[in-house]
C-alpha cells in the first residue's frame, strides 16, 4: 500500500493503468471496458482534445505507445508564412484491439474492431476491421483469419521448442503452469481450471 502511494506521488496520473484511465475519463475521453495500458509511465495519450478521442472495449495498449488527436507541425508554416493551419481530428479505436510496442496512432485515424497493430507501426487513416497492420506507414499485412491460421499452424512446434529450451536451461521439464500460452494443446475445454486467469485476461 505504501509503495503504491509513493509510486502515485512520483508518477502522478501515470502511476498505473487504472489511475491513467480514470484520469483520461475525467478529462472527457470516452474509454470502454477492459482497457489495459501496460506501461502507463511512458505511454502518451493526447487529452488536449478529449472530445476527439474514443477508445472501445477490450483494448490492450503496450508501451511506449502514442495516441494523438492533433499535429503541431503547423508551427513551421506559421513561422514561414504567418498563418496557422490547425490540424485537430477525431481519433477512434474500436473494440478488441491490440496496439503493439512503440506504435503511434496519428490524429484522424480510425482503427476498426478486432485489429492487431504491430510494433513500431505508425497508423494514419482507416484501419479495417478484422485485420493485422504493421510498418511505417502502417499497412494491412493480412486478415485476422489468416493470422489465426498462421499462429495455429505453429503452436505445436513452438510449444516443443519452449519445453526443449526450458529443459536445457533448468534441467527439468517445465510444469504445466509455465505453459500458459499452449495449454489448449494438452487440456480439454472443460479442464482448464489451472489456466482460468489466461482465459479471463480481458
Language-model features: locations:
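Terminal amphipathic alpha-helical/low-complexity segments used for targeting or macromolecular assembly
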Residues: 1-28, 33-34, 138-202
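Flexible, glycine/small-residue-enriched loop-and-beta-strand segment within the central core
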Residues: 22, 29, 36-110, 137, ...
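Short loop/turn and capping residues at structural boundaries
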Residues: 34-35, 127
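Short amphipathic alpha-helical patches
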Residues: 47, 82-85, 120, 157, ...
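Beta-rich strand-turn-strand
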Residues: 101-116, 121-125
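Catalytic binding pocket for nucleotide-activated donors in carbohydrate/polymer assembly enzymes
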Residues: 129, 134
Amino acid at each position: 500500500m505504501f509503495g503504491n502511494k509513493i509510486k502515485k506521488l512520483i508518477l502522478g496520473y501515470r502511476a498505473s493503468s487504472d489511475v491513467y484511465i480514470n484520469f483520461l475519463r475525467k478529462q472527457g475521453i470516452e474509454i470502454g471496458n477492459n482497457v489495459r495500458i501496460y506501461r502507463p509511465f511512458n505511454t502518451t495519450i493526447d487529452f488536449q482534445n478529449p472530445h476527439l478521442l474514443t477508445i472501445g472495449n477490450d483494448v490492450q495498449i503496450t508501451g511506449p505507445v502514442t495516441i494523438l488527436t492533433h499535429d503541431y507541425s503547423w508551427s513551421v508554416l506559421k513561422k514561414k508564412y504567418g498563418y496557422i493551419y490547425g490540424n485537430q481530428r477525431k481519433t477512434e479505436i474500436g473494440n478488441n484491439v491490440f496496439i503493439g510496442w512503440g506504435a503511434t496512432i496519428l490524429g484522424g485515424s480510425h482503427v476498426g474492431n478486432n485489429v492487431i497493430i504491430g510494433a513500431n507501426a505508425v497508423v494514419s487513416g482507416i484501419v479495417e476491421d478484422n485485420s493485422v497492420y504493421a510498418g511505417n506507414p502502417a499497412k494491412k499485412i493480412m486478415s485476422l483469419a489468416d493470422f489465426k491460421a498462421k499462429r495455429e499452424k505453429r503452436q505445436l512446434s513452438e510449444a516443443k521448442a519452449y519445453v526443449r529450451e526450458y529443459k536445457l536451461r533448468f534441467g527439468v521439464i517445465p510444469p504445466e503452469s509455465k505453459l500458459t500460452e499452449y495449454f489448449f494443446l494438452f487440456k480439454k475445454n472443460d479442464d482448464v481450471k489451472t489456466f482460468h486467469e489466461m482465459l479471463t485476461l480481458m
